[in-house]
Amino acid sequence: MFVHAHPDDEVISTGIALASYAAAPDTSVTLVTCTLGEEGEVLVPELINLRADRGDQLGGYRIGELAGSCAALGITDQRFLGGPGRWRDSGMIGTPANDHPRSLWRADLAEATAELVRIVRDVRPHVLVSYDSNGGYGHPDHIRAHQVTARAFTDAADPAFAPGTGEPWQVAKRYETAMPRSRAVAGFELFHDSADRNNPFAGLKSVDDLAMTLVDDADITAEISAPEFFDAKIAAMRAHRTQMAVDGFFFALADGIGQRAWGVEHFVLAAGTRGPGDGPDGRERDLLAGVAF
């Protein structure tokens, strides 16, 4: 089960993993999306009035984009935390959207956790995947998704927590998405001179100036490499057309580093027992490694 903050997050950091597990005959995948991404940019000129500061209709539109992404990745079980529209995109930290009464950032943590626990107890996954405590790059909704997922990992097994949401279930492992330092360095070397405003490397003097969390390569505990799903990931990215311009940074990165950038995804085991692995530094090549079924 993968828990993401907004539509499009599922493909950027976990599209390869989602597609590979969705295609495997003996596994199933559930994607939980916490908000509709109402505060996102609109990169399609004719759709500019969907923006939150105009018609405020972007969230509904992005439901359709998410459906297209899921179709490209082979995901057949996608759910919204608390139902579509229960919690709203909080925007970047320090913006007025943080204070919206329905923002995920302002959500009661126990209530939001109970909604994820409801899904966990229904699906009974062996693995949970979300972000690190910084949300990868400090976005309030990513931080909240981490908090909710970390608590649900423990609380789903507690019969005293949220009675009436199903039978208790102990998830075996919890992972956090990770950006290896070596990958960030490669991106910086290629793109720090780019003027694309969606390019996180633009104008930086050093890779350490990035807002995102970088993980030393030796601390990565799992990697999913499935180049056969590279095209599916790119197709899923294209489905999010309001968020990713086809001539913008994300696709330039795909062309520049290709499968080194988008064909391998990295994770850190945050809870549970590490399984066997034969990847670099003994990394697991399967998030289900060592799990007893």
Curated annotation (Swiss-Prot):
Binds 1 zinc ion per subunit. Zn(2+) binds at residues 6, 9, 142. It catalyses: 1D-myo-inositol 2-acetamido-2-deoxy-alpha-D-glucopyranoside + H2O = 1D-myo-inositol 2-amino-2-deoxy-alpha-D-glucopyranoside + acetate. It is an enzyme of class 3 (hydrolase). Its cofactor is Zn(2+). Its EC number is 3.5.1.103. GO terms for biological process: mycothiol biosynthetic process. It holds the Pfam family PIG-L. Keywords: Hydrolase, Metal-binding, Zinc. InterPro entries: GlcNAc_PI_deacetylase-related, LmbE-like_dom_sf, Mycothiol_biosynthesis_MshB. GO terms for molecular function: N-acetylglucosaminylinositol deacetylase activity; zinc ion binding. The keyword Metal-binding applies. SUPFAM superfamilies: LmbE-like (SSF102588). It comes from the Bacteria. Catalyzes the deacetylation of 1D-myo-inositol 2-acetamido-2-deoxy-alpha-D-glucopyranoside (GlcNAc-Ins) in the mycothiol biosynthesis pathway. Belongs to the MshB deacetylase family. This is 1D-myo-inositol 2-acetamido-2-deoxy-alpha-D-glucopyranoside deacetylase 2. The gene is mshB2.
